[in-house]
Amino acid sequence: IGYMLQEADLMLLNDSVREELLWNNKTMTEKELDILLHKLHVYHYRDDFPLALSKGQRLRVVLGALLSRRDNELLLLDEPTTGQDQKSLENLSMLLSYAAEQGKTIFFCTHDIELASSLADRIFVLAQGHFVAVGAPHEIFSNKEVLRMGGLSIPPMLELSEYLGIDPCITVKEVMRHVL
């Protein structure tokens, strides 16, 4: 099991990005390391001190360390999108998709409805420590009552799709498919 704290910086313990990725994975070859560094978009920073990187880069290094462990079949990520810009969110989304393709199960806590709807197979909504709903992303995120019970914001695209009189939409892409 791999676990990433919401404050991923607390998990960076080594003097270089390279050491960080190898620390918990002694069997990784140099070729595998280079591939991972490129996939994380931090190849040119491999010898740099991890905490000197941008927040998005640091997050990718921590996630990369988890992904590199072959025995991490389950990844638990606590608010992995906190403080990320759009480019970092796209990189994170690609990394999580890659992990899922590799057969890893990913459980992440997030308030980012658009990210969750694009990546998740199933959504669990919690309220006061109990599940109030479990279902497919579109089923959950188009149900205003469930969102309210879970203390989640109503997606703006859901409001817009209702206003336009089209099928319920969660993402901008969905709305655009109906409008264009």
Model-derived segments and spans:
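ABC ATPase nucleotide-binding domains
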Residues: 147-180
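A short, surface-exposed alpha-helical micro-motif characterized by mixed small hydrophobic
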Residues: 116-118
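Conserved beta-strand-loop-alpha-helix hinge in the C-terminal portion
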Residues: 130-157
